[in-house]
Amino acid sequence: MKYICNPVNINYRFQFNMDPRKGGILQIDREAADPSMIMYHGRYYVFASMTLGVWVSDDLVNWENHRLPEDLPLYDYAPDVRVMGDYVYFCASRRTEACDRYRTKDVLNGPYEKIPGNFPFWDPNMFIDDDGRIYFYWGCSNTTPIWGTELDPQTLLPIGEKQALIEGDPHHIGYERVGEDHSVAPASEEEIEMKFQGFLKRTGVTEDQLPPGHAPMIRGMFSNMPYIEGAWMDKHNGKYYLQYAFPGTEYNVYGDGCYVSDSPLGPFVLADNAPFSYKPGGFLPGAGHGSSMEDRNANWWHIATMRISVHHDFERRVGMFPAGFDADGDFFCNQRYGDWPLAVEEAQMDPWRGPAWYLLSYNKKMTASSCMEGNEPEKAADENVQTWWRAASADRKEWLQMDLGKEYTVNMVQVNFADVVEGIEPAGELVGSDSRRYIEERDLKTQWKLLGSLDGENWFTIEDKSAAETDLTHDQVLREEGIKVRYLCLTDIAVAYGMKPCVSGLRVFGIAEGEAPEVPEFTAKRVGPMNMDVEIAPVDAVGYNILWGSAPDKLYHSYMVFGTQKNVGALVEGREYYVRVDAFNESGITEGKCVKLA
């Protein structure tokens, strides 16, 4: 059997960003985002922003990163890729100049034939209908909609005028509100105008002196309106499913919604199962600006952007989740345990299958050879990708140790590194106009050794990557048959640029002896048209999964929590919901009772 454990285990390249919003400070972080996934000639390809390449796999589990030809717009965001006939078509985003397209019959080696474009766009998506007609969708803004148009099949230029298809509506769609957990309401017109006038006063300009088009954009900055972006179209049983991202990539609630229509250009109605892709909790939250694909075994997958956003708003990773359509045509995505190990077979699979193993490492006792203030060792076991242990030096003798508390059978360990890069200059020239950047082209290395022990004194090697030539910062150690261990020690560590090592998650999975939790009791109360309060009576559990949906058998949305209270702000005004709370511990998952939301 093969297994995945999000984020996708691949090398994520560093960027050096000169962001004008940060006063020109050089920000250094890793990024991959906005993934387009396709199947072409039996192989799987993922094109993601800022990777300089394409990820290739034969099984959706093991991926390799291949450089793409230099003549492609590799520094442009949100690459869109589709298969049409014998060709793979590629394009990406630019705001101020026409975006060209490219096509090839050989993804890895090219050549790529250029197809001139005639207008700028951002977050593109091309869709080929069953009748051969071609449609195009784009948009990334909190002031303008997702646009759509038909394309000429020969030139791939627009036919007719663009049409506004969907717009943000955070006054009625709770999950479109910005902020952590949708905590920020849209600003009033009075608030927007007051902040806009304050901006003009601070900068010493009048509205007439602003460049064309800048006034609406600046007002949008003060509006607290969501970014509606990242369109992706799929068709199933005659219905068109227009997926879109909300409300902003820097939030834990970054996800994908869905509108449905009988026509590729609408009119569209909000899907009954909205949001479609939503993962606000767990170790690594976020599941927005993605793409959906049916594999060669008729399994649907959704691949999407996951949020870190510590060193830069665009510090992001990529996750892949089972998806599908139910008997009523509702498009769903299973993210209940979306960053736990999941079995992947070369066969048709149940998209609602549970995790292969359970989390054994949450808040376990941690020690280390040293640490920086604020980066204590216990932060490598708190299931929060935004916190980490950081050693006091870059010496390979530094170590991080976990005591599981007793002997367990361990099946997988995921070693997640964070990045704190200081005093390093980019190896090449920063390019771009609005936000200049350089993407690291060199192949860096992340090296470590994982030791195990039953008594804390006698150690054996679980995995030795101390001489690895790879740069895998979310690497996995798989022992399908299991190993007996109580103590784990990560040592002999060397990371990129010779920096002090940082570990955001030493995550351990297996199945402990014992019973699953008792059935959890809870209350769920609607508080306002778009929010609900959930309170859980504690049981012997590590955590809980709050599930909700439009019917008892359609609990397609989930929020993993490690506490007993949560306000969920992802409801749609006027819709009825059913809620269930499941409890999990190191031995299993117990389903709760389903209730109608009052």
Residue ranges: model-predicted function:
Residues T149, W448-L450, Y544-I546:
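Short beta-strand elements bearing conserved aromatic residues within extracellular beta-rich modules
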Residues M1-S223, K235-G282, N297, M306-D350:
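Beta-rich carbohydrate-recognition and catalytic domains
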Residues K500-P501, A516, E586-A598:
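Extracellular fibronectin type III
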Residues V568-I589:
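Beta-strand-rich modules
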Residues D540-F562:
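Extracellular low-complexity, O-glycosylation-prone stalks/linkers
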Residues D382-T461, L472-F522, R526-V527, A551, ...:
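Aromatic, loop-rich ligand-recognition surfaces of beta-strand-rich domains
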